Amino acid sequence: PIAFDSDCREGICGQCGIVINGIAHGPEVTTTCQLHMRTFHDGDVITIEPWRAEAFPIIKDLVVNRSALDRIVQAGGYISVNTGAAPDANGTPVPKQDADRAFEAAACIGCGACVAACPNASAMLFTSAKVTHLHLLPQGKPENYRRVVNMLNQMDEEGFGSCTNIG
């Protein structure tokens, strides 16, 4: 049997990520675990590969070590501003428009498909999604600059490629 990673089987965690026919997660706009075989035609040749990035070393077959993404989040995914106890923090007023934008920014499930799809294996899209999400809420604004610097430095340390404009 071929080793592969999975967790939720609901399309919300991204652990199932592989490259199918050269496309991260395959030809549909979904995660691999939500991709159905009916997407393909009879007789189609289907090629599956692990994520391709120096920062994602292959553990076995289609399983890669994605802990580099976790370390980027850990480098800047914190809010150290004292908001009191949990009920107090939940009482911080957030305008609906800001809450909606933060919710949309949180749509990134952290699977690494953007890294796998990038010819340079850049984690800039992943990192910017996390930075944007944390910046949109008032609790994260006081330390935003430090968070961005920490996350970008960690991204560089992990060996992700640089962004370039590819036409």
Give names to the regions the model predicted.
Residues 17-27, 162-167:
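Short, charged low-complexity intrinsically disordered segments located at boundaries
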Residues 1-21:
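A basic, amphipathic helix-loop patch mediating RNA/tRNA/ribosome contacts
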Residues 20-43, 48:
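Glycine-rich phosphate/adenylate-binding loop and adjacent beta-alpha elements
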Residues 1, 44-167:
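Ferredoxin-type iron-sulfur electron-transfer modules in oxidoreductases and energy-metabolism complexes
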Residues 14, 19-22, 39, 114-120, ...:
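Secreted/processed peptides and extracellular or luminal domains of membrane proteins
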